[in-house]
């Protein structure tokens, strides 16, 4: 289930735009994972919640607001985040282009490349937790888990990316949280909507081995 949650968290970045055909590379590994996902069903689910669920609608409005815009800018100013994006770009993954699809949709500042070198949820009650739980229920967890294990053995590019994530300087995220009022307000907003932020953080730390 943790693998499925991780794929949901990466879905926008890996499938927002199509990757150009190349020799076998990291983009092919991502395409293999995305190929397991019921994308049409997930899109229908997202649209249903956006059209009918007030909590999800309020969340979308928040993501389009000034406070989250500040969080977005602060997050992508972190050197560890810029380094990871640069790594993905050099591996042939259009990370900036994918993220800028999200930025354009939400009215956020577009990201520009620099030279600097995602779950167990509460019971379904609608709102954000309901959306996430239904999305996770659509995930072929066993197949995703098996593909993850296979990729770690067979794809040097995928293994290198995972090791890159394991070595990600996550302490910069903690420092950002402690220093940014906007980030703290965003966390409180998510918690007020019933999202167990602390648990999500623990899942990510466990998945990547962050201590």
UniProtKB/Swiss-Prot annotation:
Domain of life, per UniProt, equals Eukaryota
* Keyword annotations from UniProtKB, A to Z: Signal
Q: Where is the signal peptide?
A: 1-19
Q: Does the keyword Signal apply?
A: yes
Q: What is the name of the protein in this document?
A: Protein G12
Pfam families per UniProt = Ins_allergen_rp
Q: List the disulfide bonds.
A: none
Lineage start: Eukaryota, Metazoa, Ecdysozoa, Arthropoda, Hexapoda
UniProt key word Signal:
yes
């Amino acid at each position: 289930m943790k693998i499925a949650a991780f794929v949901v968290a990466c879905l926008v970045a890996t499938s927002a735009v199509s990757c150009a055909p190349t020799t076998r590379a990291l983009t092919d590994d991502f395409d293999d994972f995305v190929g397991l996902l019921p994308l049409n069903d997930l899109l229908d689910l997202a649209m249903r919640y956006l059209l009918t669920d007030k909590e999800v609608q309020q969340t979308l409005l928040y993501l389009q607001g000034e406070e989250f815009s500040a969080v977005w800018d602060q997050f992508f100013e972190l050197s560890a985040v810029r380094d990871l994006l640069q790594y993905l770009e050099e591996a042939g993954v259009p990370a900036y282009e994918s993220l800028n699809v999200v930025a354009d949709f939400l009215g956020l500042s577009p990201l520009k490349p620099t030279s600097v070198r995602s779950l167990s949820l509460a019971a379904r009650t609608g709102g954000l937790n309901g959306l996430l739980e239904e999305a996770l229920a659509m995930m072929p967890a066993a197949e995703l888990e098996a593909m993850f294990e296979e990729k770690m053995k067979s794809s040097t590019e995928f293994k290198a990316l995972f090791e890159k994530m394991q070595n990600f300087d996550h302490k910069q995220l903690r420092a950002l949280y402690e220093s940014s009022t906007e980030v703290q307000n965003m966390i409180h907003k998510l918690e007020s909507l019933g999202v167990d932020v602390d648990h999500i953080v623990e899942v990510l730390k466990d998945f990547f081995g962050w201590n």
